[in-house]
């Protein structure tokens, strides 16, 4: 664990250059620099603007349904209890209950309000699991903006429900066949579109990745998750959680939960990546576990690379974790040892998916299922009765067909 001054300093990051330590930055074509500058200026102007905040807070309450509940998972807690009844007390931060079924709406809504204020009529986004695409299509429908979503062809097949939802709300979904037809390729295509149409188009990047100011903006718009959690913990037991647990692909749901508590060194921050078919194979997405530092999609971070420094393809049963990079702030938190990152396999995630469904009647997204599955490793290591808050980042409706196919239901 790092010293308190180092942790305190973290809250001021990124620095003026958009860096978290050596990570982050702006590695983009010159044509995008004015747009990134415009976005940062607009964000700095409006984040403290009373009319912007009033509109955002009203919509988060009345349209999204915030605050999302902090739910005590009684039967999951009992499952991991010791014979004497002690053990971890497990709570779920229910982002799955938000409008559209995941945390992604927090960022999409706040960004579309920025896009309106800077005069952009066309919005583009990338999506993997489809939840960010659905959230973006949703807010564009709400505000009458043109919407184009880039999605890998492979992800469109395994997330067909979300493709239909996006189209139903008026979005154009453009299939991306390049590479493996997954999230990395969709992001690359979205950036190409933005370079071409930068004057008229706002790019709602869906995770805490990409060039500055996106990792900062997306984090800040998701920080409401942790802020609500702090208040709810105080209401429920008059204190703080002991452990925060979340899945990590790009890392937006995790940083949304973690950020409020980074300067609380007694709280463990644990991110869970996708080990796919195993970290000893070439089919995984365990970027923080096995990656090396490089540049992808405009930012320096840990990446999955080959010996020549070429980005290699990631694999996960979960479309939202199937990404060979990670947000730069997570790379920084790993390096200063403020957060811990582990990985679980597709098989373990499927077990977590079924476990939460059967014990709590809550069907989690396959992304969330990775965090649920890590309890199997974590709980036996713990002493006493620590309180664990898991970010239930999304619901599993979108994954039911995939899981049914794999498990032969």
Curated annotation (Swiss-Prot):
User: Which coenzyme or cofactor does it need?
Assistant: pyridoxal 5'-phosphate
N6-(pyridoxal phosphate)lysine: residues carrying this PTM: 104
Pathway involvement of the protein, from the record: Amino-acid biosynthesis; L-tryptophan biosynthesis; L-tryptophan from chorismate: step 5/5
Which InterPro entries does the record associate with it? Trp_synth_b_CS, Trp_synth_beta, Trp_synth_beta/beta-like, TrpB-like_PALP, TrpB-like_PALP_sf
> Transmembrane region positions?
none
> Pfam families given for it?
PALP
Q: Name one GO cellular component term.
A: cytoplasm
Taxonomically, the superkingdom here is Bacteria
Q: Which GO terms describe its molecular function?
A: tryptophan synthase activity
What EC number(s) are associated with this protein in UniProt?
A: 4.2.1.20
Q: Give the family, as the similarity comment puts it.
A: Belongs to the TrpB family.
Q: What does this protein do?
A: The beta subunit is responsible for the synthesis of L-tryptophan from indole and L-serine.
Which HAMAP family does this chain map to? Trp_synth_beta
Checking PANTHER family in the record gives: TRYPTOPHAN SYNTHASE (PTHR48077:SF3), TRYPTOPHAN SYNTHASE-RELATED (PTHR48077)
The name this protein goes by in its record: Tryptophan synthase beta chain 1
